[in-house]
């Protein structure tokens, strides 16, 4: 069983996201420890990028703050090395294809393998172009995690059949951010996914409250939350890890029902 599969093995998974380096890497490390200690099953780590096209204003702001603080891909790798001394849950990078290309794809993925990164999400990588990275990901044992947005049944089935790690189901078209209600027929998407793969699926984009998380976990195998955590960092700065830990605990309790 892959490390990512273990995140879903004990029941519904809660998956928080954080942008590395916002407001600084020391705070990111403390937040990762707080999330892991309070029940996060898997953590998505954003490597900051100057043009994060999938993100709404909250996570765009986090990217900008992290870059202004001097965060680089190498510094993020060092951060993961440090937290991996005692954080055993799966860690997945979420970044953009350009970050991987500019670093050198093989160098990037070999470093991921060395420091204990379990998966990679590239929101700007179309399914049709995933073979640019898939062979290297397989070579280094890093799951290339696909995203499924509301689309045709045939396309959902096609993406699901080749899924690795887990499937990231996008709750609605558009950018990340918190939403008051989610209108997409997610149950229909999950049904098609489950007919085509045993790989678990989690829903993200727009989830912020325990009620929303519980509802999404009722439909899929887990819930993903990013913007709500970034807002805590925006509000509390270096004091945010304690608040983030308490928030993750509430969300995990909701997901497990």
Name each region found by the language model.
Residues 19-24, 94-102, 126-127, 147-151, ...:
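Glycine-rich beta-to-alpha transition loops that act as phosphate-gripper elements at the mouths
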Residues 76, 191-199, 208-257:
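Alpha/beta catalytic cores of nucleotide-metabolism and tRNA/nucleoside-modifying enzymes
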Residues 1-7, 50-59, 71-81, 101-107, ...:
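Active-site-adjacent beta->alpha loops and helix N-cap segments on the catalytic face
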Residues 40-51, 117-121, 126, 171-177, ...:
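Glycine-rich phosphate-binding active-site loops on the catalytic face of alpha/beta enzymes
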Residues 25-35, 151-161, 203, 207-223:
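Catalytic cores of alpha/beta
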Residues 14-18, 43-45, 91-95, 120-122, ...:
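Hydrophobic faces of well-ordered beta-strands that scaffold small-molecule active sites
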Residues 47, 60-122, 255:
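Active-site beta->alpha loop and helix N-cap motifs at the rims of alpha/beta catalytic domains
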Residues 1-18, 80-85, 256:
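N-terminal amphipathic alpha-helix/helix-capping segment at the start of soluble metabolic enzymes
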């Amino acid at each position: 069983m892959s490390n990512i599969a273990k995140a879903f093995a004990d029941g519904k998974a809660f998956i928080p996201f954080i942008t590395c380096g916002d407001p600084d890497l020391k705070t990111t490390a403390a937040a990762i420890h707080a999330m892991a200690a309070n029940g996060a099953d898997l953590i998505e780590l954003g490597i900051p990028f100057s043009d994060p096209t999938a993100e709404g204003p909250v996570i765009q702001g986090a990217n900008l703050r992290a870059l202004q603080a001097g965060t680089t891909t190498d510094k993020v790798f060092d951060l993961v090395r440090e937290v991996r001394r005692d954080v055993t849950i799966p860690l997945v990078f979420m970044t953009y294809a350009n970050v991987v290309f500019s670093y050198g794809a093989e160098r990037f993925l070999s470093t991921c393998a060395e420091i204990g990164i379990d998966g990679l999400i590239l929101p700007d990588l179309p399914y049709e172009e995933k073979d640019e990275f898939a062979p290297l990901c397989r070579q280094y044992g890093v799951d290339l995690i696909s995203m499924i947005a509301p689309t045709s049944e045939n396309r959902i089935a096609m993406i699901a059949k080749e899924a690795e790690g887990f499937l990231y189901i996008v709750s609605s078209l558009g950018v990340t951010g918190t939403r008051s209600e989610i209108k997409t027929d997610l149950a229909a998407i999950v049904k098609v996914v489950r007919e085509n793969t045993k790989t678990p699926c989690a829903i993200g984009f727009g989830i912020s409250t325990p009620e929303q998380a519980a509802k999404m976990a009722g439909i899929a195998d887990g819930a993903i939350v990013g913007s709500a955590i970034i807002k805590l960092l925006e509000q509390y700065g270096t004091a945010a890890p304690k608040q983030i830990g308490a928030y993750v605990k509430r969300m995990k309790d909701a997901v497990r029902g």
